[in-house]
Amino acid sequence: SGQIQLWQFLLELLSDSSNANCITWEGTNGEFKMTDPDEVARRWGERKSKPNMNYDKLSRALRYYYDKNIMTKVHGKRYAYKFDFAGLAQAMQPVQADPSMYRYQSDLTYLPGYHPTKLNFVGTPINPSTNASLFSSHSSYWSSPTGANIYPSGHVTHPHASHMSSHIGTYYG
């Protein structure tokens, strides 16, 4: 998502030593401590335009990261957490496309930097309301007699649906 995530916000605070009054690194293994957890929560609430944010709510959000292997609680230390940078890097990986949605792998070779094991394609849904404006202008070019009959047989071929991703049907038809 385009919105800042809590873990990104915490790293942002930790990257500036002037925030040591509320959050600071402890050691070199990704461990950090909230020296003023209420202030960290207040700043997070300010950033997200949520004035009712408090440490209880922020810590609930942090617990969500445990299952995602993004961070863990440091046992025996109050307000201490540890980033799992390997898990964080894994969580940041884009969704991998299913190569079977293409009829031939050679169809993908035109993509710059394409490598079968490093395919980072994410399909973007098409919004019909924005596309309508692309075709709604009636310029003299398209209304000319030669432009009106660009397909002499009047037939347009369509790709076979068998190799298309199943979500395409929700946008067309």
UniProtKB/Swiss-Prot annotation:
Predominant location: nucleus
Extent of the signal sequence: none
InterPro entries according to UniProt: Ets_dom (IPR000418), ETS_fam (IPR046328), WH-like_DNA-bd_sf (IPR036388), WH_DNA-bd_sf (IPR036390)
Keywords: Activator, DNA-binding, Nucleus, Transcription, Transcription regulation
Record-annotated disulphide pairs: none
An example Gene Ontology biological process: cell differentiation
Localization of this protein: Nucleus
DNA-binding region: 1-84
Stored Pfam families: Ets
One Gene Ontology cellular component: nucleus
Transcription in keyword set: yes
Domain of life: Eukaryota
Record GO terms (molecular function): DNA-binding transcription factor activity, RNA polymerase II-specific; sequence-specific DNA binding
PANTHER family: DNA-BINDING PROTEIN D-ETS-3, ETS
Task performed by this protein: Acts as a transcriptional activator.
Similarity field: Belongs to the ETS family.
Name by which UniProt lists this protein: Transcriptional regulator ERG homolog
Gene (UniProt): ERG
